[in-house]
Amino acid sequence: MDTVLIANRGEIALRIMRACRRLGLRTVCAFSEDDRGAGYLDLADQAICIGPAPALQSYLNIPALLAAAEVTGAQFVHPGYGFLSENAEFAKAVAQAVLTLIGPSAKIMRQMGDKVAAKQAMIAAGVPCVPGSAGVLPDDPDALLRMANDIGFPVILKAPGGGGGRGMRVVQAADELAAAFAITHQEARQFFGNGDIYMEKYLRHPRHVEIQVIADRYGTATLLRCSCPATVSALNRQR
């Protein structure tokens, strides 16, 4: 159990290789035809081509990555970030291939990738959360207004699968609610394939608090904490 297949490229792959080297692990770097000859590949113990330049045919090609792991004898798969790093189907496929993904399980990815499910899990664990709806919103203007009044304006409407500022809209007053719901619902369906929406209290002057937890399957966990003032980008991505 000493070989890691790196399912990523460039600086990300380089950082993983350096970490593996410090831990005494052998590295296999998967690469697309477009990255053949790239300098970062020289640091890998082995490099293997997984397909043509388009990401769908290489870095997002699950069967090709699993085949690369089998051919090279890798026992671990590190997806880095981006590409397949938050893809629950990839995590499931890696587990079914009797390999170890360096990352969350498919179950956790599905849960935390849906903001409503993630918030429900946090509430169940006793984590303080921003006031909001208990689940997705009904397509009922009267019910929406009651919820918004209970929470208190301004509120923010958000898509459970949204991100990057898309699929969310701030509602300052009751007369804006119906139109904002319709637009956010349409955006969510268009960009994320799911028109579900949930509601939270909008924070006018938030602080961006980032919490990272590193844990293994045996229950050993380390908490890393970083708190800093919200940037414009973070304000546009209230979660």
Question: Which functions belong to the PLM regions below?
Answer:
Residues M1-R239:
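N-terminal beta-alpha lobe that positions the nucleotide/phosphoryl donor
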